[in-house]
């Protein structure tokens, strides 16, 4: 129906749409070639369960979580936090204090 309406208004548009539909129908109705049935042989399939259970703490994926590094003194970090708590040194911000 749309094709007939376009054909009445624009003869060239109707013809080109008709050719487009004809080519599209031919491409869709043509039989597709069958793919060869290539499947993985049974001896290559992976086992569903692990043969040996993992020892220790594991997550859902069977991975052990990383443990944090052993706590020790961190002098540079502790100094930075101490300075941060003390507040800024205003002498660093004003150049004319010593003048």
Curated annotation (Swiss-Prot):
Q: Does the keyword Cell inner membrane apply?
A: no
Q: How does it sit in the membrane?
A: Single-pass type II membrane protein
Return one GO MF term. protein-macromolecule adaptor activity
Keyword Endoplasmic reticulum in annotation: yes
GO CC annotation, single: membrane
Q: Which InterPro entries match?
A: Frey
Could you list the residue ranges that cross the membrane?
10-29
Phenotype upon knockout is: Mutant males are normozoospermic infertile. Mutant males neither have significant differences in testis/body weight ratios nor testicular morphology. They do not show any alteration in basic sperm motility. Sperm from mutant males passes through the zona pellucida, but fails to bind to the oocyte membrane and accumulates in the perivitelline space. FREY1 and SPPL2C double knockout mice are normozoospermic infertile.
Report the locations given in the UniProt record: Endoplasmic reticulum membrane
Organism superkingdom: Eukaryota
Q: Which keywords fit this entry according to its UniProt record?
A: Endoplasmic reticulum, Membrane, Transmembrane, Transmembrane helix
Q: Which residues form a coiled coil?
A: none
Tissue expression pattern: Expressed in round spermatids (at protein level).
| Single GO BP term | protein N-linked glycosylation
Enumerate the residue ranges of region (Disordered): 60-90
Provide the function of this protein.
Answer: Key regulator for male fertility expressed transiently in round spermatids where it recruits IZUMO1 at the endoplasmic reticulum (ER) membrane and coordinates the oolemmal binding multimeric complex (IZUMO1 complex) assembly. Upon complete assembly of the IZUMO1 complex, its ER retention is released, facilitating IZUMO1 complex export to the acrosome. Through the interaction with SPPL2C, inhibits its intramembrane protease activity directly accessing the catalytic center of an I-CLiP.
Matches recorded under PANTHER family: PROTEIN FREY 1 (PTHR37872:SF1), SIMILAR TO RIKEN CDNA 1700029I15 (PTHR37872)
Task: Note the subunit structure.
Answer: Interacts with SPPL2C (via active sites); the interaction stabilizes FREY1 protein and inhibits SPPL2C proteolytic activity. Interacts with IZUMO1; the interaction retains IZUMO1 at the endoplasmic reticulum membrane and coordinates IZUMO1 complex assembly.
The protein's name is Protein Frey
Name the gene that codes for it.
Answer: Frey1
């Amino acid at each position: 129906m749309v094709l007939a309406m376009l054909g009445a208004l624009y003869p060239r548009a109707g013809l080109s749409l008709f050719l487009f539909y004809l080519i599209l129908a031919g491409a869709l109705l043509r039989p597709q070639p069958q793919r060869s049935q290539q499947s993985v042989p049974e001896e290559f399939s992976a086992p569903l369960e692990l043969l040996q259970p993992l020892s220790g703490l594991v997550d859902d994926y069977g991975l052990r979580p990383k443990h944090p590094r052993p706590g020790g003194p961190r002098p540079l970090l502790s100094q930075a936090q101490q300075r941060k708590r003390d507040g800024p040194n205003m002498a660093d911000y004003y150049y004319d204090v010593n003048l």
